[in-house]
């Protein structure tokens, strides 16, 4: 079911629903997908709804309600072939990650326009995805985290203070992560990026820098967002 204003995506309802099901499955399978901006925005709505239903199914003690929620989830996914274990992954791995988060499980980041037709592209990803897998390999996704760490590396290389906006964004990331986990993920990303940039990786130095960075991130003196003025100004009648 589509609630509110939705993009038709140049398809009839059946083809549109099939497309969004496929995109949602790919997102839950790989934690990150690239598509046109419009498709990413619509797939984000579907994915958010599925995660909300899964959280409710996990936390409810009513077996009837749980069965209904599972049926709703299954109706929004293709559960054949490579996706046959997707329900298990949703309930055991993805939804538990967001039990303390009230919403905002996905993120859409704009990319450069597509080369062949200049269509606006974006990346759709699950927030708070682990950077490293259990086998200690780098996971796909979490583009925002990589961009933030790259900004930190550039600041350190140029001996500049960290950008307040970078600290604010890292503060948001840290809200639902343990400090030790965040420290480890930043160190891993630094190691990979410094190698790609052909820069030396001094573990002791980077560890010291990361600890100092996290002190800034968790500091209560972080700059607060300024409230944007309303576009309408109310004035009394003459």
Curated annotation (Swiss-Prot):
It is found in: Mitochondrion. It holds the Pfam family Ribosomal_L17. GO terms for cellular component: mitochondrial inner membrane; mitochondrial large ribosomal subunit; mitochondrion. It comes from the Eukaryota. Keywords: Mitochondrion, Ribonucleoprotein, Ribosomal protein. GO terms for molecular function: structural constituent of ribosome. GO terms for biological process: mitochondrial translation. Gene3D superfamilies: 1.10.246.170, Ribosomal protein L17. Disulfide bonds: none annotated. Component of the mitochondrial large ribosomal subunit (mt-LSU). Mature yeast 74S mitochondrial ribosomes consist of a small (37S) and a large (54S) subunit. The 37S small subunit contains a 15S ribosomal RNA (15S mt-rRNA) and 34 different proteins. The 54S large subunit contains a 21S rRNA (21S mt-rRNA) and 46 different proteins. Component of the mitochondrial ribosome (mitoribosome), a dedicated translation machinery responsible for the synthesis of mitochondrial genome-encoded proteins, including at least some of the essential transmembrane subunits of the mitochondrial respiratory chain. The mitoribosomes are attached to the mitochondrial inner membrane and translation products are cotranslationally integrated into the membrane. Although this protein has evidently no mitochondrial targeting pre-sequence, it is efficiently transported into mitochondria. Belongs to the bacterial ribosomal protein bL17 family. This is Large ribosomal subunit protein bL17m. It comes from Saccharomyces cerevisiae (strain ATCC 204508 / S288c).
